[in-house]
Swiss-Prot record:
Keywords: ATP-binding, Cytoplasm, Helicase, Hydrolase, Nucleotide-binding, RNA-binding. It catalyses: ATP + H2O = ADP + phosphate + H(+). InterPro entries: DEAD/DEAH_box_helicase_dom (IPR011545), DEAD_box_RNA_helicase (IPR050079), Helicase_ATP-bd (IPR014001), Helicase_C-like (IPR001650), P-loop_NTPase (IPR027417), RNA-helicase_DEAD-box_CS (IPR000629), RNA_helicase_ATP-dep_RhlB (IPR023554), RNA_helicase_DEAD_Q_motif (IPR014014). ATP binds at residues 53-60. This is ATP-dependent RNA helicase RhlB. The lineage of its organism: Bacteria, Pseudomonadati, Pseudomonadota, Gammaproteobacteria, Enterobacterales. Signal peptide: none annotated. It comes from Sodalis glossinidius (strain morsitans).
Amino acid sequence: MSKTHLTEKKFSDFALYPPIVEVLDSKGFNNCTPIQALTLPTTLAGKDVAGQAQTGTGKTLAFLTATFHHLLTHPAAEGRQTNQPRALIMAPTRELAVQIHSDAEPLAQATGLKMGLAYGGDGYDKQLKVLEAGVDILVGTTGRLIDYTKQNYVNMSAIQVVVLDEADRMFDLGFIKDIRWLFRRMPAAAGRLNMLFSATLSYRVRELAFEHMNNAEYVEVEPLQKTGHRIQEELFYPSNEEKMRLLQTLIEEEWPDRCIIFANTKHRCEDIWGHLAADGHRVGLLTGDVSQKRRLRILEKFTQGALDILVATDVAARGLHIPSVTHVFNYDLPDDCEDYVHRIGRTGRAGESGCSISLACEEYALNLTAIESYIGHQIPVSKYNSDALLTDLPAPKRLTRRRSGAPRHNRKRPG
């Protein structure tokens, strides 16, 4: 981590439950990020907080630290049953829920608190088996949580801590009714520690906090610019005919260690995947049509370095912390300005630098004006020589012929 990303405040400065400090220290977390330094004094005192911070700022560790400390320093409800978790962490997507659960595992192992997962699309019986054994902290998405609650596999009446992560995304995906349904089955707000985190503290997010939290303190961590000052942005204007060749040429020139390519539709993502896989790249595909088991395998391979490139729709643009992503390519400029910020926020995280390259083609160039207005600056434009683009590229693979990719082969440019 870069020192400029951290504050002078140390985790050891707080009166944290000792095993928590030991885990943080073993993982190299000594100094707090701004969102951690600003929220922990409030949450560790048992007071509610609504925090605004972009992804990659350390908010997950902020609420996990507070959650574990609170449970370890406060007794469970008297007469608590096996199906009654003590803490509930709600996330908008299953990928984010899995990520939070993974981040919490070292703390769980060190403290003896039991973790559970509840998300749709996969593993119903496997998740249920863990819940039936009893969990202290339950991480999940609203649909599966409601399912388990309605069948009395989970009872929310002994909840002591509630975390709502990516609250603005919850609104975008239409989950707010589900969240309110779950809140109504918990103890009153005054009897819980409530934490909410969001990329924006809009009126609707503040209204949610007012309804279901107890005089929450609002904490805002604004970046120097919405896109992050460690991200180098670049923009090209390709024709539709040259767009794919330009992408492949840029990948060849940049040779990114680990990159994510975003496109606006699953069909476009499949097309990109086919071209790159045929060209020998170690590339994975992440869209809504990919099964949950395969999505998790792809993310694991990408995180561990078995894949160099991930082609994705915006399903992967929020919440996922994949370390050391060096490049983000916007093959299509997004229709939603916020999606641009969230996409390129996959790189330049936790004090690292990153590179974002966008292609403003004939189809999506009209989105650029709104994006630049939203981020508050113009994206630097670069030019390319059409004659220098790669030409002897293989025909794209069909999606049904998924393979991990063969060794890259040498190519020549014309001239």
